[in-house]
Curated annotation (Swiss-Prot):
It is a multi-pass membrane protein. One of its GO terms (molecular function) is 1,3-beta-D-glucan synthase activity. InterPro entries: FKS1-like_dom1, FKS1-like_dom2, Glyco_trans_48_dom. The gene is fksA. Its EC number is 2.4.1.34. The keyword Membrane applies. Residues 74-83 have a biased composition (Low complexity). This is 1,3-beta-glucan synthase component FKS1. It catalyses: [(1->3)-beta-D-glucosyl](n) + UDP-alpha-D-glucose = [(1->3)-beta-D-glucosyl](n+1) + UDP + H(+). Component of the 1,3-beta-glucan synthase (GS) complex composed of a catalytic subunit fksA and a regulatory subunit. The chain crosses the membrane at residues 487-507, 525-545, 564-584, 591-611, 655-675, 707-727, 728-748, 1329-1349, 1386-1406, 1473-1493, 1497-1517, 1588-1608, 1630-1650, 1666-1686, 1701-1721, 1766-1786, 1826-1846. It is an enzyme of class 2 (transferase). It holds the Pfam family FKS1_dom1. One of its GO terms (cellular component) is mitochondrion.
Length: 1897
């Protein structure tokens, strides 16, 4: 009994010898609750309606009162749960363990009624402690378990929160206590009393070795659930339904697993006698041995035979299961629930493996019922379960991803395919073949041990042998072939059918344009019929890919050989007729061929439809078949999709019929028919005359038209894919709008009279009035709710006092003498009338938005609310890592960023002027009251003037006195308008206020009962709110917070004592060399403050190790999920908000789960087939993005979220396609926690953790709904960088999802309409972005090939009225006009595809806010260039997915939540966006430049805009980018950024950027020198060689081919009449231009290396910058060489501009390919430090040890690539800066630019920063210096560009015809014949040049 002073604990509860437990009181023992002090002061009836000064203020909820301590809680319902050190915790001796006394001293006699110290109080309201006890310190302290258990009689000790055991209530004869779980009160009705439940828990702890704290936590968890259910049904029904949900019901995961894994057969006949499927050799041997053993034991055999004689079908097993469940006693049901919860509550990472927990529970349950367990006397040691069962599994998980290096855990360099993740481990338990793999060191199997003995043997299992990969998440594009095979089938099949029919020239022998001869009819049919073979080929590829990803050894893998055989047969059937028609048409008659062709076509059509509709998993004998038990696990866990019924099903069919109907019609007429003429023209076209290129055969030149045609068809195919997404967006939007009218959420349904009927609707829809005992007039009840809403808005400073007066219900004298009546505000009537809009609240204000949405939403259909007493309990769960809790004064009123021009407070005042005004008035009233209280005299007239001046500080910073209570008000005002945790918590605590308000309004008898005692009334309301609503923040870093964070958290806890905080507590290792011990701990505002400023935790549960193994967020949620309470969880991010009027609807929202009413039928009645209703797993809610309207970027981000979270969610939920639980969704607690938790957590793979919860829910049979009448606020990113970080995170996360098994299950098993909904809502969006960017690139490639063709040919005179058989004039011309028309159509298509993203936003605004709001918002968007941002975002998305699928490296990117007002330096922006966008944009712009000079058409203007967007968006959306001074200061920074980092290391430098972009391919060396470098770098594993090969070698090589071919063609000298002309040597020319710089750079590098080695060490002593100077010279030479080579190209092309541009495009592609080749194939891994780079320039290699031998060679190759890249970056950076010059020269451009970015009027603009004199002078000097440099560079660049053009026009040329290097200008080549002679001349071509065009015109 050490540690407990004797005599303190008698008879199981403790006496307070020291006059009470002071921490529940303040020092003076005064009253705990002062109604004027707390935020809910409007519950005080006396002052309720008096809104004139005084009472109504409540100061923002009363938290500003600095003296507001946590002693406010007078009601003692809250148990601390740990008053003294717990039993064995910090190394106490064994004797201290409570288990010793507990187990042996059980005495049933202590249960007599006269000793009911634990207060089974009755349900009346008079059970508060008598006032005689108040203030005396009898504080109802309830000792924690570790103390209670020493009590002599009652030994339980687990009744965790006994909320309120004051002496007055607990002593016999005194008033009864308030129950913690009132609905589970101990009257005769409960099947098991809570004391018995407690005993069950203690018994289980002693038998299995669970932790005490975990037991107390889970006891509270179970009791809260029972209480929650029993409040709306009988206790017996509550227990039964809970048991059915967890263990035995049709929807219980445990029951489904039990039958899926054939454990009914194991229980019946044993594993040895089961017929099992495939297994490896080792397992087969083990099976044989087990069978032999069974045969040796004849008694067992008889039993087995007896059992086998019985019926082992699934039906019989289900019957046996139900009867077993039916016979179970309530006590046994509770025991099973308790055991399951205890297993789950300590399972750490194993909670991600639901079937593994089921297995553990099954073993434990079998063991419990065994004689061995029942006869145990000694309790099992605490922590046994954790250490023996969970920790080995945890360690296996952790070791998959981490290894120990120097005593620290370091991430292994493994990609997902090598990591056995949570899902692989979990899937071992799906099939009996998996379970039988579980064996011990001695190779015996766990399944050969009798079930009852398995638990004790579980600790000896060798898990390493058991687990294996069940799905390979190989990083590859081939996943898409398998997962989305039906998308390829539908699109490629339809495209083939359309195109083949319209391309007869491709299969017409000797086609002649003047004859327009057609192919035979059979060929028409058969050519189209080949589409069936194409579709079959896709399916064959999909099956082969599936073979790669699903290991054959997994029992759930489908048999693919049979399917493959079938598919090959189908392929042959679809191919053979075509081969006959085309190959044997000479042998067979045309009639037979025609019949074969027609049959071929219909076979193809049938194949196409069959493969389009049938899921891949359902082909030819699938495991989707319902009969047979072999694959029941895969059906259960991956294909239990809830069926769509009725309207939903028809809506789903309707949507997709509309989408594809419209798509196919439009694609046929717009895309296919527009390609018909180009195909007819280009396919037979031959180049007539062609001198060709040296070393290259002439056939290339002649085939240019066919190459172009191939590229055009590919381009058409990409547009064909894009069309589908376009129509999906349009149709989805139409369906969504139709549904919004149906629900009444649109403002275009005025017949609903949303305002005039609002009071009636509040009465009928928000209040549960049917069960009210005392009936009041509706107006009395409505007025209380309405006034509460208005006052809450007033408190939040949204409404001024005069607005409030107009909006409140007022008491006025009535006609009857002495009576008073309520007068309703005129608002309800006049608000419908548009002319009165501004009378009640400021136009366009937050208050208007909130009231309008509230009125609108209660007009929609809502479930009827239950009374508060009967509503279910729910928890709000908020994960928090490092987000701002509360803004500090320093952050608000000083400019933090060196580049920012505004303080946060200034900016917020600009954004919310009206709210700031209300706040200031409020503060002044408060200050005046304070000064009057302090006895200051009244002011006279003269003082009034002075006070105006004195009030200035209020308007500037919100306070005049620096007293904390005033500064805190300003901090809170700002925090409530930024994205802070404080805003989130204060918003979601409105649930508590709403519940109290509803309870008070609906139960007037409660108010009457307490008479005038508002303190007791408030206590009763608090009790109810606390019982029904919990809020828990998971602050994993809480224990490591700094002082400021700790203070802010403490402030939160004092403001909201019911706020629970779960955090990770760390203890140093007990022994040297061990790991530190980690605990999940929980505190709240009632917990005792310790001396170190921390609070004493209520629960502290030890973990197996560090739980943060993944990307953080999901692990953070997982460790705190054990502290959720009740039936539902609302998952919230730390940047959200909620409002009182929304919280009032919570009962209707929870009713959407369809669990509030249950039939009184037992789910366990055997023989009766219960109709399994699919449970609702997730309920989505709307989001209002409160960061909209803070400028263009914030608004774009907000509009995206709004349309996705509301507009699309509305239809997707309806048609079963919604997966996301975007936050603020509600989750079904039991459903989700028994199926792997609320998110997944494998590092990298589950980066977008929340969507996996949605996919799991869908696959496992849960429905996902969307609720239209409830919305929370949410913040979004506001700055360019943070929005794109978020975009990158989503994009890379999507790349990871493509690899995931969930996509495989959904893609290969969903029915067609559901599959399409899933595809287009999730992966389709990202693939669409990739197709958009692919189409842009393809279009540019088509344009350069077309440009080359047009440049070298003469275009025919075109007349669209003439028939196509008319001869072309002039003869041998090229008929390119239809091709130019096709180009224009493509531009239109791509343009529409980009702009379709604005349609949902426009429609959303139109339906919900009206035409004017839509017009203004869109006008603002377009006026702010948001379309350029859209193009850029599209590229970032596409790049993120592409990079991730190639290289991986997905990681959580923390996104900024702050306001983006700071200017970011050019160098930083360039390095961040060069790789993803600027490089690609500049390559495409070069191509566009060539196209513009050869095939100009006005439609290309759109491409100039969109491609410029890819390059300049980062700078265009950078605040103050065009401020004159800042621009040149920035230029200075850019020059420094380029040059630094070569003599000493610098993180922000060009060389650091260059090395970082290399490491993707090379990876880092594993040797960690000293401290591992930044987190970002360590997580990047080296990409797989095959991935590097395809994306870094093959892709650039293709780029070389598609740019080199047109370059060689344009230099082929076509149209030469003279046959003796020599071919030009374009190959050597391009080689000189491409390889020249590389050679020079290599020479320079080698030479400088020698210089550095010889001179570096000597010069380094005196000249510190020797290395930097050497590097600068080398880099300068590289730049000069690049500029020289540009001129050389110009010169060698005889000053021809188009040829030079195309030559540079081609040379750049070749150089890029060479550099990628060097980096991919020749470079070894990179060091994390950059010593070798510095050594190269300084010659100091001796620091590098042995590496100084290997590194110089590697560094030489690096330098070759670096110099090449540097020269490109230097030139490109300057060009970008020059492009900004025109904008820079516009007067007042900075003001205009800021208007665009921040949407602030020029009058409210942000002032320029103020500098000291010294700073100003320095800045001016720098500006002058660097402006001179900038303009010098500009002039130099212009000279280099213009000089050659002048030389050409002047006719200056040098005939330098060595090796025919010079390209003749060939301006006069023309071999067309103007006069037409003869007929049937072959169509030929000749070269055309600008001058030739004029000649031939």
């Amino acid at each position: 009994m050490s540690g407990y002073p004797a005599g303190h604990y008698e008879d199981g509860y403790g006496h307070q010898e020291h006059g009470g437990d002071a921490y529940y009181q303040d020092e003076h023992g005064q009253a705990y609750y002062d109604p004027n002090d707390y935020g809910d002061s409007y519950y005080d009836r006396g002052n309720y309606y008096n809104a004139e000064g005084g009472q109504a203020y409540g100061q923002e909820g009363g938290y500003y009162d600095a003296g507001h301590q946590d002693d406010y809680y007078g009601d003692q319902y809250y148990d601390q749960g740990n008053g003294a050190p717990r039993g064995r915790r910090r190394g106490d001796s064994e004797e201290d363990s409570e288990t010793f006394s507990d187990f042996t001293m059980r005495s049933e006699t202590a249960r007599a009624a006269d000793m009911d110290y634990y207060g089974r109080g009755d349900e009346r309201y008079n059970s508060y402690a008598d006032s005689q006890y108040a203030g005396r310190g009898y504080n109802g302290y309830r000792p924690p378990s570790s103390q209670v258990s020493y009590g002599a009689n009652r030994s339980s000790g687990a009744s965790t929160p006994v909320y309120g055991m004051d002496y007055g209530s607990a002593l016999p004869g005194g008033p009864r206590s308030r129950e913690p779980y009132p609905a589970w009160a101990s009257d005769g009705q409960v099947p098991v009393s809570k004391e018995e439940i407690e005993d069950i828990f203690i018994d289980l702890v002693n038998k299995f070795g669970f932790q005490r704290d975990s037991m107390r936590n889970m006891y509270d968890h179970l009791m809260t659930q029972l209480d929650s259910r029993a409040s709306r049904m009988t206790p017996n029904q509550a227990l039964l339904s809970l048991h059915a949900d967890y263990i035995g019901g049709d929807n219980a995961n445990y029951r489904r697993w039990y039958f899926a894994a054939h454990l009914d057969l194991d229980d019946a006949v044993g594993f040895a006698n089961m017929k099992l499927g495939k297994a490896d050799r080792k397992t087969r041997k083990a099976r044989k041995a087990a069978k032999a053993a069974a045969q040796q034991n004849p008694e067992n055999v008889e039993e087995n035979l007896e059992a086998m004689e019985g019926d082992n079908s699934l039906e019989a097993a289900v019957y046996r299961w139900k009867s077993r469940m039916n016979r179970m006693s309530p006590h046994d049901r509770v025991r099973q629930l308790a055991l399951y919860m205890l297993c789950w509550g300590e399972a750490n990472q194993v909670r991600y493996m639901p079937e593994c927990i089921c297995f553990i529970f099954k073993c434990a349950d079998d063991y419990y019922s065994s004689p061995e367990c029942q006869s145990r006397v000694e309790p099992v040691e605490e922590f046994t379960y954790l250490n023996e069962i969970i920790t080995p599994l945890y360690q296996f998980c952790r070791d998959q991803g981490y290894e120990i290096l120097d005593g620290k855990y370091v991430r292994r360099e493994r990609d997902h395919e090598k990591i056995i993740g949570y899902d692989d481990m979990n899937q071992l338990f799906w099939y009996p073949e998996g379970i039988e793999r579980i064996s011990f060191e001695d190779k015996t199997r766990l399944v050969d041990v009798p079930p009852a003995e398995r638990w004790t043997k579980l600790k000896d299992v060798d898990w390493k042998k058991a687990f294996f990969k069940t799905y390979r998440e190989t990083r590859s594009w081939f996943h898409m072939i398998t997962n989305f095979n039906r998308i390829w089938v539908i699109h490629l099949g339809a495209f083939w059918f359309f195109t083949a029919y319209n391309a007869p020239t491709l299969y017409t022998k000797n086609y002649q344009q003047q004859l327009d001869n057609k192919p035979a009819g059979s060929k028409y049919w058969s050519a189209v019929g080949f589409g069936g073979a194409l579709v079959g080929l896709i399916q064959i590829l999909a099956t082969l890919c599936e073979w790669m990803y699903v290991p054959r050894r997994w029992a759930g893998a489908q048999h693919l050989s049979k399917r493959l055989m079938f598919l090959i047969a189908v392929f042959i059937v679809n191919l053979a007729p075509g081969v006959v028609v085309f190959g044997f048409n000479n042998v067979l008659s045309e009639t037979i061929c025609l019949i074969i062709g027609i049959v071929h076509f219909f076979i193809a059509l049938a194949t196409f439809f069959f493969f389009s509709v049938m899921p891949l998993g359902g082909l030819f004998g699938s495991y989707l078949k319902k009969h047979g038990r072999q694959y029941v696990a895969s059906q259960t866990f991956t294909a239990s999709y809830p069926r769509l019924n009725g309207n939903d099903m028809w809506m789903s069919y309707g949507l997709w019929i509309c989408v594809f109907g419209a798509k196919l019609v439009e694609s046929y007429f717009f895309l296919t028919l527009s390609l018909k003429d180009p195909m007819r023209i280009l396919s037979p076209m031959r180049i007539h005359q062609c001198a060709g290129v040296t070393y290259i055969p002439n056939s290339l030149c002649h085939a240019q038209p066919q190459i172009l045609l191939g590229l055009m068809m590919f381009m058409d195919l990409t547009l064909f894919f894009l069309d589908s997404y376009l129509w999906y967006v349009i149709c989805n939007t139409i369906f969504s709008v139709a549904r919004s009218f149906y629900l009444g959420v649109s403002i275009w349904s005025p017949w609903r009279n949303i305002f005039s009927r609002l009071p009636k609707r509040i009465y009928s829809k928000v209040l549960a009035t049917t069960d009210m005992e005392i009936k009041y007039k509706p107006k009395v009840l409505i007025s209380q709710v309405w006034n509460a809403i208005i006052i809450s808005m007033y408190r939040e400073h949204l409404l001024a006092i005069d607005h409030v007066q107009k909006l409140l219900y007022h008491q006025v004298p009535s006609e009857q003498e002495g009576k008073r009546t309520l007068r309703a505000p005129t608002f309800f009537v006049s608000q419908e009338d548009q002319s009165f809009k501004t009378e009640f609240f400021p136009a366009g204000s937050e208050a208007e938005r909130r009231i309008s949405f509230f009125a609108q939403s209660v007009a929609t259909p809502m479930p009827e609310p239950l009374p508060v007493d009967n509503m279910p309990t729910f928890t709000v769960l908020i994960p928090h890592y490092g987000e701002k809790i509360l803004l500090s004064l320093r952050e608000i009123i000083r400019e933090d960023e060196p580049y920012s021009r505004v303080t946060l407070l200034e900016y917020l005042k600009q954004l919310h002027p009206h709210e700031w005004d209300c706040f200031v008035k409020d503060t002044k009233i408060l200050a005046d009251e304070t000064s009057q209280l302090n006895g200051e005299p009244e002011k006279n007239e003269k003082d009034a003037q002075k006070s105006k001046i004195d009030d200035l500080p209020f308007y500037c910073i919100g306070f005049k006195s620096a007293a904390p209570e005033y500064t805190l008000r300003t901090r809170i005002w700002s925090s409530l308008r930024s994205q802070t945790l404080y805003r989130t918590i204060s918003g979601f605590m409105n649930y508590s206020r709403a519940i109290k308000l509803l309870y008070r309004v609906e139960n007037p008898e409660v108010v009457q009962m307490f008479g005038g005692n508002s303190e007791k009334l408030e206590r009763e309301l608090e009790r109810m709110a606390r019982r029904k609503f919990k809020i828990c923040v998971s602050m994993q870093r809480y224990a490591k917070f700094n002082k400021e964070e700790r203070e802010n958290t403490e402030f939160l806890l004092r403001a909201y004592p019911d706020l629970q905080i779960a955090y990770l507590d760390e203890e140093p290792p007990a022994n040297e060399g061990e790991e530190p011990r980690l605990y999940s701990a929980l505190i709240d505002g009632h917990c005792e403050l310790l001396d170190n400023g921390m609070r004493k935790p209520k629960f502290r549960i030890q973990l197996s190790g560090n739980p943060i193994l993944g990307d953080g967020k999901s692990d953070n949620q997982n460790h705190s999920i054990i502290f959720y309470r009740g039936e539902y969880i609302q998952v919230i991010d730390a940047n959200q908000d909620n409002y009182l009027e929304e919280c009032l609807k919570i009962r209707s929202v929870l009713a959407e789960f369809e669990e509030l009413t249950t039939d009184n039928v037992s789910p366990y009645t055997p023989g009766i087939a219960t109709e399994a209703e699919t449970p609702v797993a997730i309920l989505g809610a709307r989001e209002y993005i409160f960061s909209e309207n803070v400028g263009v970027l914030g608004d774009v981000a907000a509009s995206k979220e709004q349309t996705f979270g509301t507009l699309f969610a509305r239809t997707l939920a309806q048609i079963g396609g919604k997966l996301h639980y975007g936050h603020p969704d509600f989750l079904n607690g039991i459903f989700m926690t028994t199926r792997g938790g609320i998110s997944k957590a494998q590092k990298g793979l589950h980066l977008n953790e929340d969507i996996y919860a949605g996919m799991t829910a869908l696959c496992r049979g849960g429905r996902i709904k969307h609720c239209e009448y409830f919305q929370c606020g949410k913040g979004r990113d506001l700055g360019f960088g943070s929005i794109l970080n978020f975009t990158t995170k989503i994009g890379t996360g999507m790349g990871e999802q493509m690899l995931s098994r969930e996509y495989y299950y959904l893609g290969t098993q969903l029915p067609l309409d559901r599959f399409l909904s899933f595809y287009y809502a999730h992966p389709g969006f990202h693939l669409n972005n990739m197709f958009i960017m692919l189409s842009v690139q393809m279009f540019m490639i088509v344009l350069i090939n077309l440009g080359a063709l047009k440049h070298e040919t003469i275009t025919c005179r075109y007349n669209s009225n003439l028939p196509i058989t008319d001869p072309l004039r002039p003869t041998y011309c090229a008929d390119l006009t239809p091709i130019i028309a096709w180009v224009n159509r493509c531009v239109v298509s791509i343009f529409i595809v980009f702009f379709i993203s604005f349609v949902p936003l426009a429609v959303q605004e139109l339906t919900e806010r009206g035409l004017w709001r839509m017009a203004t918002r869109l006008a603002k968007h377009f006026g702010s260039f948001s379309f350029m941002f859209e193009v850029f975002v599209c590229q970032i998305y596409a790049n993120a997915v592409h990079q991730n699928l190639s290289f991986g490296g997905a990681r959580y990117i923390g996104t900024g939540r702050g306001f983006a007002t700071a200017r970011i330096p050019f160098g930083v922006l360039y390095s961040r966006f060069a790789g993803p966008s600027i490089y690609a944009g500049s390559r495409l712009l070069l191509m566009l430049l060539f196209a513009t000079s050869t095939v100009w058409t006005p439609a290309l203007i759109w491409f100039w805009v969109s491609l410029l967007a890819l390059c300049i968006s980062p700078f265009l959306f950078n605040p103050h980018q065009f401020a004159w001074h800042d621009f040149f200061i920035d230029y200075r920074d850019y020059i420094r950024w380029l040059s630094r980092g070569n003599s000493r290391s610098h993180a922000s430098s060009w060389i650091a950027f260059c090395r970082l972009s290399r490491t993707r391919l090379t990876g880092y060396k594993r040797k960690l020198l000293g401290v591992p470098s930044e987190k970002g770098s360590g997580d990047v594993p080296r990409a797989k060689f095959t991935n590097i090969f395809f994306s870094e070698i093959i892709a650039p090589l293709v780029q070389v081919a598609v740019t080199l071919v047109p370059y060689l063609y344009i230099n082929s000298r076509t149209g030469i009449s003279n046959d003796n002309e020599r071919a030009s040597n374009a190959v050597v020319r391009i080689a000189i231009v491409a390889f020249g710089p590389i050679g020079v750079n290599a020479g320079v590098s080698g030479m400088f290396f020698g210089m550095a080695c010889c001179m570096g060490p000597i010069f380094g002593m005196c000249c510190k910058k020797f290395g930097a100077v050497l590097a600068a010279i080398a880099h300068a030479i590289a730049v000069i060489i690049l500029l020289v080579i540009f001129e050389v190209m110009f010169f060698l092309e005889s000053w021809s501009w188009p040829r030079m541009v195309l030559g540079m495009i081609s040379a750049a592609a070749i150089q890029r390919f060479i550099y990628k080749l060097i980096i991919s194939l020749a470079l070894t891994r990179e060091f994390k430090h950059d010593q070798s780079n510095i050594a190269w320039w300084t010659g100091k290699w001796y620091n590098m040890g042995w590496h100084s031998l290997s590194q110089p060679g590697r560094e030489f190759l690096c330098k070759i690539t670096e110099l090449g890249y540097f020269s490109a970056d230097f030139v490109l950076g300057h060009i970008l800066l020059f492009v900004m010059l025109p904008a820079l020269c516009i007067p007042y451009v900075d003001k205009f630019h800021s208007v665009i970015l921040f949407w602030l009027r020029p009058s409210r603009q942000i002032r320029p920063p103020i500098y000291s004199l010294k700073q100003s002078k320095l800045r001016k000097r720098r500006v002058v210096r660097f402006a001179i440099l900038y303009f010098t560079m500009l002039v130099l660049f212009l000279i280099l560009l213009i000089a050659p053009l002048v030389a050409r026009d002047e006719g200056i040329s040098v005939n330098l015809n060595i090796m025919s290097l010079m390209q003749p200008l060939d301006t006069d080549n023309n071999d067309t014949i103007s006069s037409y002679t003869g007929n049937g001349l072959p169509v030929g071509y000749s070269a055309w040049t600008p001058s030739a065009a004029s000649a031939s015109a």
